[in-house]
Every structure is written in structure tokens, then in C-alpha cells.
Amino acid sequence: MNLLDIIIIGIVQGISEWLPISSKTQVLISSHYLLNLPIAIAYSFGLFMEMGSIGSATIYFRKDIMSVFRDRKLLLYLAIITIITGLVGVPLYIISDKLLKNAYDPSIPMIILGIALIVDGLYIRYSRIKIRSFKDLSLKNIILIGIAQGLAALPGVSRSGMTVSTMLFLGIKPDDAFRYSYLAYIPAAVGAVGTTILFSKTNISYVISLIGIGGVLISVISAFIIGMLTIDLLLRFAKRRNIYIIDFTLGGIAIVVSVLTILI
């Protein structure tokens, strides 16, 4: 077991989870090359690694989480997003193994998402879209966000990219879009980890036999620490930028990383 490799995988998870570059795909690639994991097992490990990111979001947004439970409308909206995410995401997760075994290239959805973010930015830049709060959204808007998050169960599709871009398109101000995207992430990620353990128990056992429980814990803790720092930096960035600048930046990151993924 190479300790540096395990820490690197945790760092990859801690950074990529909060950017529109599909953390599960980045962990898939890094663990495939660093730990020599088969693709399907590396994908399951990528989802399992979200445990570290769940910790990051839960600790960072602990005050927001408490306020959610005091606000019935906000709690209802996040519950609906979670339910829709599960209805869309679980079937897609079940077929993900088959997709990865049939020459499915996860970098393609990242390129498409990057282009969509840039188009979204152009639309916002040249239209008179009304800025509103998350609680001003309609039920239809909330369902749309849930569908967007559920689609991220597919390899190469970024959860944060899908939800943040959808919220920006709906007129949510950037820092709120990031904040509520990350709050919606917590229950969805808990479900993703649970689904991974339920349907991919053999894959996770293989990883544990290879790097040990200690190795998995080190990787998860690395993801947790780096995730806290990344969330803070992104929220600071979002507060100081216009919506379309956020879209252009995230879209550019998604396209660059996906091209690098293809080259690797």
C-alpha cells in the first residue's frame, strides 16, 4: 500500500466533488491508475469515497442544516429534491456497471455539461433574468433540480455541475446556488453510499482487501479535510462574481478536465 497514492485519491475526491467535473469519474481514473483497480470497482470506490465529502458538507453547513429543520418550506423542498433524485438516480446507478463495460466514455458527459454551462452563462448574460431566492422557486423548479441531481448517477455526469447550473439558470444568485446545491447533496450522497454498499458490496470488499480499512479511512479523511477548504474557497468566489462569470468558469473547468481525461 502506497500511502501517498491513497492520500492523492482523497485529495482528488475533496476537490472534484464540489466542481463540475464528476468526482466519481476523477476517483475512478486516479484509483484505476494508482491502485490498478478494475474500472467497475474503481467506479464503486469513487461513490464510496463520498463519505468524506458528506462529512465536509455536514460540518461546514451545520448551521444551515439546523435552520432547514426550522423552516418547513425549505425542508419540504430539499425532501422533494432527495426523493426525485432517488427515483431517477437509483435505476441509472444499477445500469452504470453495464455502461462502463461497454466502452462508455465518462468524459463525454463532462464536455456536454461544460458546453451547457457556457450556453447557460450566455443566456443569463444577455437576458433579463430575475434574481430570486431558493424559497421563491416553484414545485416544478424543485422537481427539475431533483431530476438534474438524479442524472448525476451516470458515470461522467457531475452532480454539483448539474444542480448549480440548473439553479443559476432558474435565477438563483451564485452563492445561494452553491449553498443549496451542497445542502441537497448531503441526503443524496448518503443514499449513493448506501446504494453502493447494497449493490456493490463485493467491489468495496475488494478495495478494503487491497489497501486495508486504514487505507480507506486515510483516503476518506483526506477528502474530508480538502473538501472543507474547497467549499470555503468556492463560496467566497461565488459571492464576488456575476452569475454568468460563474457559469463560464465552471464550464471552462469541465471542458478542460474532460479533455485531459480523454488524453489520459
Swiss-Prot record:
Q: Which residues cross the membrane?
A: 34-54, 75-95, 104-124, 137-157, 180-200, 207-227, 243-263
Recorded GO cellular component terms are: plasma membrane
InterPro entries from the xrefs? UppP (IPR003824)
Location relative to the cell: Cell membrane
Recorded E.C. number(s)?
3.6.1.27
Q: List the disulfide bonds.
A: none
Write down the superkingdom of origin.
Archaea
Catalysed conversion reaction: di-trans,octa-cis-undecaprenyl diphosphate + H2O = di-trans,octa-cis-undecaprenyl phosphate + phosphate + H(+)
| Function summary | Catalyzes the dephosphorylation of undecaprenyl diphosphate (UPP).
Q: What protein name is recorded for this chain?
A: Undecaprenyl-diphosphatase
Gene that codes for this? uppP
